[in-house]
């Protein structure tokens, strides 16, 4: 049965519809906001897997080109593998939804939001999020919903709910907030040095509308009736001999948890578990069914030990206090032939960033339903398996794309405008070691490598990952969390920024009782930590170098009138090709008359610039040129002043420096005098040798008539 509900959110109505499309799915919702429409479906498999310690969820957001009235570019006219944007939106949908599924359900779950229409004004990602959340909530899959999402922008000192693409582009803050009726579950976005209070107010603003959308979803239950949920695959089980296991390993496991060094600590914990496993095996108390429960009980003890130590003793497994940051080492210029390089090491997390400068030809072309784009800044994050001491495939996964995007957003607000710095910039982060917060280490190393490459960034940027351990009575906020603190904790909050404010952030919350005061405390503790990190980075490199690397391509720009573009290009590109070949430069001509020269030799680039300026320059009487003799006849010579301009040097014209002789003496007159065997050359002919085609001669413009014809005379040195 078709049901439709709508709610005013910002400038448009959010329309949710179910019962018309994809009725064989476990759940399906069509969401529309303005002219953007997304269909989201959810299905689960029939096969059941017991004792899973994770939710087998996959989210596959996809955009159809027909949604914008386009046909895919390139040779293949079918949508192919997911684009980075689709991966990022899939992660936005996945992260707030995953904790609300019951692990005991034991079946694979697939959520597929598909953009069917877009007005290229209202971003379809936020529409897809609400479509997916509603589809899952209305399905027969056990889910602790409802949840909803809202985007907030801050522009001209005002908050805008679900802003347009143009408003996002002009804003100083762009965040996506997801949450339930119980509280915020996820925040992600970028900013241009905004304060912590503005961020908190934006989250507050978003939550007001999130609750309204959640209530709208609940209205569907009254309209269509609550569906009977599918049964859980298994009941929660515990290890039968858990008390005996606690008595056997608890204190030994506690000692192992506080061994210094990630690898040593993991090895010590593994040894304790192995000894316990052998003990229970010898008593024949382990079998295939309860072996998983045995290891789960060990993990529960480990989590209890770590959390209790932090809450009661303010002591973390590596010996730090909650606010303490690991030792930091920062270096630049490790790689001599690169354009800029930096190494940032924080404890057992290490990121090597390399900046490469290219030309506009190196820009990333994006064929997108929201409009074609060219990106002149890219950050690529690589997380090889050796960074955590493991083997595996070297490939770019969703995690790498997501972490790279967060680091890129954190840095891009500090980059110069393209008109001021017309380079394409690529930063590659190689994570060489990882024990928590590698994306924030990427921000730090990336910022320093940009400065080392000579990119005129506005401010240094640093990042830090915050964590949370809480119970019913108290909470402890952790600075610079380890990997295990991320796994065992209640919150992962990454904050990047400058000394002036925040530029990037990502928060995932696993509990429902996070208050505004808690977030304020976390942001303030993150700000203090960020200032500490910035001070260390500034001691190594505090501002961009005045010049770019000698290994980077050089750029020279000039502006010409639009109506002169054709002169620079020439017939069939002849002129611009000649400039390219002669001076070994690459020439890019924009429609607004801006010309950019790329090359490696400064002298040749300046000569190429002078050549172009001479081509477009309007000739004036009295100007002197080094012209090329193109053709000679009995009346004089045609002299090429520039590839697009010629003048005529008459044999009757007189030089300003010689009133008695003609400027040109044609060869036949010379031969006539020589027939008599004597040199009858006049004084002026001896002073001015014969001109030959191809000869370079210095000439002066003596006159320009009303038709633009140029008359020349020889110019004396």
Curated annotation (Swiss-Prot):
GO terms for cellular component: cytosol
Record EC number: 2.7.7.8
GO biological process per UniProt: mRNA catabolic process; RNA processing
GO molecular function: 3'-5'-RNA exonuclease activity; magnesium ion binding; polyribonucleotide nucleotidyltransferase activity; RNA binding
Catalytic reaction list: RNA(n+1) + phosphate = RNA(n) + a ribonucleoside 5'-diphosphate
The keyword DNA repair belongs to this UniProt entry's keyword annotation: no
Annotated signal peptide: none
Residues holding Mg(2+): 486, 492
Biased composition (Basic and acidic residues): 654-666
Region called Disordered, residue ranges: 650-678
Occurrences of domain S1 motif (ranges): 622-715
Xref: SMART domains: KH, S1
Cofactor: Mg(2+)
Keywords attached to this entry: Cytoplasm, Magnesium, Metal-binding, Nucleotidyltransferase, RNA-binding, Transferase
Residue span, KH domain: 553-612
Subcellular localization: Cytoplasm
Chief place of localization: cytoplasm
Family per record: Belongs to the polyribonucleotide nucleotidyltransferase family.
Biological role: Involved in mRNA degradation. Catalyzes the phosphorolysis of single-stranded polyribonucleotides processively in the 3'- to 5'-direction.
Xref: HAMAP family: PNPase
The name this protein goes by in its record: Polyribonucleotide nucleotidyltransferase
